[in-house]
Amino acid sequence: MPCILYMDDTSCLIDLPTSLQFNKHILPTRTKPVVKPYLLPEKSTSDYENSGKGTVGQVLQSLQRVRRALQLRSLDDNQSTDKSHHVQFQDIVYRSNTSASEIHFQAENAPLVQWYSDIFKVLVKAPVIQFEDQCLQWLKMLNTIPPSYSFITIKSKDTVELGLEEIYQQCVQNDGASAIKLKLKGSKVITESSETNCRDSIYYIPARSSFIMGDVEKTAQILLEAIDGHLEKPKCIIIDPPWPNKSVARSSVYKVNRNLGYLKALPIQESLSKTGVVAVWCTNKEKYVNFVKKVLFKKWNLTLVSTWTWLKITAFGEPLFDVYSNMRKPWEQLLIGVTSEYTSVYSDKIPPTFTIIGIPDYHSRKPSLKPFISRWFNCSANESLPVLEIFGRSLTPNWITWGREPLLFMHELYWSSDN
């Protein structure tokens, strides 16, 4: 199933879990989609001054364009039938059967159904990963000493068993042509509220993928030595910083650093190829947007060429929040900067604005940019481009993932074999 369900010059409809798929025989699980927009504790208003007026118009136009295109496609498919030509957007995307543990897709009037399986496995609640006391002691000790470089190559076999202390703050690579399962010793996964339902922590490591697990503030030298000695310099760097956020800080979903200075210290110029692109995911807070544009890109000697938008929608095709809300927006921004050498070689390859429309699933998980990066470099989708993902929480073939949780969404519970 392709992850891009519709695309034109200014927008696309993407299936987020499928965009992260690394093997055609290993299917992504997904959460039940939100059916109705979230209500915010404020009055609905069309007065959106200083709240992304330009973006509001952009996302609404993109959403309307996608709806119209899908309806026309459905009408073409139904021309030879006696069925009604009036097709709702929710019939084209998907519906949630709230009484079951799977998502059932509406097939009667939905032309996109041919790209879906009839049933997708749904992981209703994200698993909780816990480490044994010995592992926690190892982590505490390792965090007190400077990491020393070691490049670990996982040999081709079905399952490899390693301890956390063996891979932490090291560069690990699967250089084989197929995915490998990594059993992480000393850790367990709780799949329900009770600890009685536990299982081993087993993670998929995609073919030719690499990762560095550790704080970016402490392991930058590990990355640079890996690129210098074993890995190709990335042509694209994707950064998804844990921006300070009150609700996230309260939930303790992941570590948030309120001091943004560490972002300036990221070794972007040392890591990026001369004709390179840097894409930074950012919240809608003006302070952080300006920090990326005026501080980070300036320090990294990059030119801002594009601002993309990821519009989050419900299963019925509505924005997740009121687009006019001054409290919260149903989108996030992707700020794209390029080197001067990139501009001279690949001029006009990145649209100045673009809207990615999709149904979100697990907390803060972003759609993969892999379907778009090949276009930025004017190459085929099958060509292997070296990419570095900083603060990433999943692995991609031919990419390097660097951060505290590079294996999070690679746990086997987030995937299911088609056999």
Swiss-Prot record:
rRNA processing in keyword set: no
Segment forming the signal sequence: none
Keywords in alphabetical order: Cytoplasm
Q: Offer an example of a GO molecular function term for this protein.
A: mRNA m(6)A methyltransferase activity
Listed InterPro entries: MT-A70-like, SAM-dependent_MTases_sf
| Compartment annotation | Cytoplasm
GO annotation terms (biological process): mRNA processing
Q: Which SUPFAM superfamilies match?
A: S-adenosyl-L-methionine-dependent methyltransferases
The superkingdom listed in its UniProt entry is: Eukaryota
Q: Does the keyword Cytoplasm apply?
A: yes
- Where the protein is mainly located, per its record? cytoplasm
Which PANTHER family is this protein grouped with?
N(6)-ADENINE-SPECIFIC METHYLTRANSFERASE METTL4, N6-ADENOSINE-METHYLTRANSFERASE
Family according to the record: Belongs to the MT-A70-like family.
Q: What's the protein called, per UniProt?
A: Uncharacterized protein C22G7.07c
Organism source for this protein? Answer: Schizosaccharomyces pombe (strain 972 / ATCC 24843) (Fission yeast)
